[in-house]
């Protein structure tokens, strides 16, 4: 079974790749892509918080 932290990080990576693609589209003038970039960045922020919580929980279980 894969570690929850690894799963969250892989999801963050996927979100980041999609955000980068949409950032390029936004730079070319597609304003809708800018909205998708902002949404992806919010998702990444939430995933980062989930990673911090999960790491803390796993650390506390060890001791």
Give the role of each language-model region.
Residues 16, 41, 48:
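Short amphipathic alpha-helical/adjacent loop interface patches that line ligand
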Residues 27-35:
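Short, surface-exposed loop/turn segments at secondary-structure junctions
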Residues 44-54:
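Amphipathic alpha-helical coiled-coil segments
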